[in-house]
Amino acid sequence: MTKRILSFVWFFVVILLFVFSVQYVKNESSEHNKQEIYSRWQNKYIINTFQGSYVNTSSHNKRGVALSEAQGYGMLISVLNNQDKTSENQFYDLYTYYKHHRVKGTYLMSWCYTNGAKKQKQADLKNNATDGDLYIAYALILASEKWSQ
């Protein structure tokens, strides 16, 4: 009888070790995957300029298009990422670009800005997109809670 109980105990211990090891590997690879996706996103979509960084929504890097919605998403992604200094610096670069491209007399970002264009369409510079402004505002709230600067 004791042999049987002992074999059940060993079986239970082996199963527990297996479950814990699988869970550990899953958690480690999940965090690694998040960081890998964030790095790929940065390399593919983030364009750095002397006025900060923007999320490029165009297939051209030289004449990239910055939309306020994409800028808001980019700011949110940076805040929600867990790479402390990297994501914080990325957020502030995106924020700096936002500050340089607001509709005159407001705190709202111009809905569309084409980098490298000799002349911007006046309609693009005088109008904003509410959804982009809401994403930016939400990202600013989260950033103030996370980094308190």
Language model segments and positions:
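Extended ligand-binding groove/face enriched in aromatic
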Residues: 99-149
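Well-ordered alpha-helical scaffold segments within catalytic/enzyme domains
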Residues: 70-86, 135-148
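Low-complexity, Ser/Thr/Pro/Gly-enriched N-terminal "stalk/linker" regions
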Residues: 6-8, 15-69, 80, 85-115, ...
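Positively charged n-region of N-terminal signal peptides that target proteins for export
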Residues: 1-5
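Aromatic- and histidine-enriched alpha-helix N-cap/loop-to-helix transition segments
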Residues: 62-73, 127-135
